Amino acid sequence: SLKGMISVGPWGGSGGTHWSYKANHGVTEIIIHVKDNVKSISFKDASGDISGTFGGKDPRENEKGYEKKIKIHFPTEYLKSISGSTADYNGVLVTIRSLSFITNLTTYGPFLSFGGGESFSIPIADSVVVGFHSRAGYYLDALGIFDQPVPEKTVSFGPWGGPAGDDAFNFKVGSWIKDIIIYALAAINSIAFKDANGHCYGKFGGQDPNDIGVEKKEIVDNLEHFKSIAGTYGNYKGFEVVTSLSFITDVTKHGPFSHASGTAFSIPIFGSLVTGFHGKSGWYLDGIGIYVKPRAGQGSIFIAPHGQSGGFPWSYEANEGINAIVIYASGNISKPAFRDTSGLNSATQGGVNPKDFGEKKNTVSILHPSSFLTSIGGQYAQYKFKDLFTTVTGLGFTTNLATFGPFDKLSATSFSQPIHNNMVAGFHGRAGDYLDAIGIFVKTPDTAVFR
């Protein structure tokens, strides 16, 4: 089960629409279509569940690309990271131009070789990729990953900086990082930390007696969650060292400290908590990385879907509270989509039939956190459009304050969940031409949504 995830990325352009995929078990197969750029991507996990295809909507035959299939022999082998490059395609859109998949045993790719654009890679250890997210339309516009620590471990990002430094450092805190003490001027001379229990770590660096820098002390409030770092590294007095640093919480950014110069680094992670640091130091701070774990939580409960077995499996679990649901309906439920308060959008589920994708758009807005989704109800029945399907024909959504719907007509077999003291944390089911089945993930309102 998925006990907690960290969202990393995405990298790429802003075209297309949001999507996300989270595997029920380990990712075992990835299919991409490539030609000049990455056209589309799809996934299969160890339970046999298959995602939809993300991207590949350009109708021109010469833009379909060539299929490349990656087989991952889970659980002996597991996916741990990705790398690639992004650039303009046809002079208009920024898309994924090359892509590699990194497991604990080998690297698959790169698929396509593109010399220009912006490259991306994630120096990450002690983690398993449990899903993907980003944007797609005609092509794969952007790509990010959901990461989960290897059991009993945190995830290690980095280090960034140079190879020198005689003194390696490595620590994790049992509480939270409270004080950060930096000596900096034209580079990061040294750094030290103190946790909420008063334990001190460092100082790391600062061994040049003629250049100790200027002290800067930053206090992280206990209401903030320290989630990432950013900075630059480059040449300083003949050494490749960290030249500037920023510390990012869920509330604000502390820094930058010193003057940014050289190569920039950042890691866009969400739903995370920094629990420690690692790196190398000597006269200066030569390199730095972070240990990260998901925010604490007990997970969600899976409630089986209502409907039939047509279409393909899908699932969506929110990072935070669900605040928007969009449904197209006309005779049945054609294609729902979801969004949460962190901005994470699901892919549109169903609606594949180009001649019957629902005439009426319905939007449910939920004012989270004062209002939160607690249950769903609806109906499923046979629906005929040339062929006969059993699909979800009506759907309603219940919050702690109100009921929205039912949307579309009431007919045949009804379903509802008489559950209490809970919050809906996500949805799952089956979809193809229409919404064939739908179920929910629930949790108690005061626990995290991940599982």
From Swiss-Prot:
Pfam families with a match to the protein in the record: Jacalin
GO terms assigned for molecular function: D-glucose binding; D-mannose binding
Family annotation (SMART domains): Jacalin
Subcellular location: Secreted
Keywords recorded for this protein, A-Z: Lectin, Mannose-binding, Secreted
Activity regulation summary: Hemagglutinating activity is inhibited by D-glucose (MIC=25 mM), D-mannose (MIC=6.25 mM) and Methyl alpha-D-mannopyranoside (MIC=3.13 mM). Strongly inhibited by EDTA, activity is slightly recovered by the addition of calcium or manganese ions. D-galactose, alpha-lactose, L-fucose, sucrose, raffinose, Methyl beta-D-glucopyranoside and 6-O-beta-D-Galactopyranosyl-D-galactose have no effect on activity.
Similarity section: Belongs to the jacalin lectin family.
Full protein name: Mannose/glucose-specific lectin
Protein source organism: Parkia nitida
